């Protein structure tokens, strides 16, 4: 990428102050800096899995992006192979959707299907989809900071397999983090994603070379004209999709509300009539039998 900087004299990551225009919650930013910083990616993987860095022998991003060719429609989840025997699919979901449950299952299945026709099933790798979000994606779910979902038997709750699952990191619920979540640095990472000013980010990155490296890359991309054009294009696309979604919901409510109100009115009348008839039956000694 041709670097066309829009910097003032002496302006660097170390001296940056104020609002970060494109943060780690930009999925294009997130994908790019994670594929560039093995140290940061290792730290995030360890936090999500609850393992130590010494357990990471090899980590390989299967779908790196090229900012020279990135488009607003590009899928921005990170698919990686850990220690050559496990697939991790990490995605940011920062816009509302009614279809995340179906989509997450589809993405998980696609990631799990890593063998060709005629290959041995033993070559399949353990696969987990990790969703990092600030949205309410599962209706009626109890608030939880880090939720883990597996296939289980409904009767005895025995786990079908631990090699196929979905984990959700809910950025809005850091106050519900467990001691294990804190020890595994999940709250630290959640705060990195939520950092919207350079002061907040640098305070978190202090004495952590891998995160300082990420901060430097975020700074550079925020002041690279070509990168900013891509990031802004993607943001507008996401916002447009979110607006169309919200508009569709509002329009549907407007269209259906008269029908809903009419049904409620009819239901109330039926309930009143039923109560009146029950009172008459009781008054005249008529039994239900």
Model-derived features with residue positions:
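Accessory alpha/beta interaction modules
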Residues: 1-165, 175-177
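Short, charged alpha-helical interaction segments and adjacent helix-coil junctions
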Residues: 2-18, 88-93, 187, 191-289
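Non-catalytic, well-ordered alpha-helical scaffold segments
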Residues: 27, 39-42, 124-127, 166, ...
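Generic amphipathic alpha-helical segments used as scaffolds and interaction surfaces in large
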Residues: 32, 176, 180, 201-205
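Generic structural signal for hydrophobic core residues of well-folded globular domains
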Residues: 33, 48, 172, 192-193, ...
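Short intrinsically disordered coil segments
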Residues: 144-150, 182-189, 233-235
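Extended serine/threonine-enriched, polar tracts that run as long, contiguous segments within proteins
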Residues: 158, 163-187, 193
